[in-house]
Amino acid sequence: MTAKIVIAGAGSIGCYVGGCLALAGKTVTFLARGRVAAALARDGLRVTDLDGRDHRFAAGSLSVEIDPANALSSADIVLVTVKSGATLDMAGLVDRYAPSAAVVISLQNGVENASRIAAAFATPRTVLAGMVPFNVVLTERAGESLRVHRADRRPYSG
């Protein structure tokens, strides 16, 4: 069985990490707001880095959802990649819609976010803290794929 991974917050970090997971053959759904969801559906996603990675996902080739219930209801893993200010709102959506067995991983700036997520759940869940030790730049140009670029050479596995 392939784990269904939901990227809960399809901004620069979410799109980059999700794109890398999709490149590795993982089943990924992006939970995105309207503007990003529309850009991904219309123009696709381009994942690049300083080491020469340059991959385009064609329009319509990625699973993109704007409805949290649809995105989260069958998640095995939820990667929370929203800005810290939106942590509790996203935790509420995960609590409401994701299966209780789903593993939740915070990939956010700030040392308290994983514990804030765990505290927001009505019943205990597995919540882990992760980190993204590199910068990602998101570029959006009309008629081009939404581009996420790893903008430094710090090592990562992916």
Tell where the protein language model's regions lie, with residue ranges:
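Nucleotide donor/acceptor-binding cores
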Residues: 3-4, 76, 125
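Residue-level detector of alpha-helix initiation sites
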Residues: 12, 85-86, 111
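ADP-ribose/adenylate-binding Rossmann-like module
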Residues: 94-112
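Redox-cofactor binding/interface segments in oxidoreductases and associated redox assembly factors
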Residues: 78-80, 106-107, 129
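NAD(P)+-binding Rossmann beta1-loop-alpha1 motif at the extreme N-terminus of oxidoreductases
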Residues: 1-51
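Rossmann-fold dinucleotide-binding core
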Residues: 73, 109-158
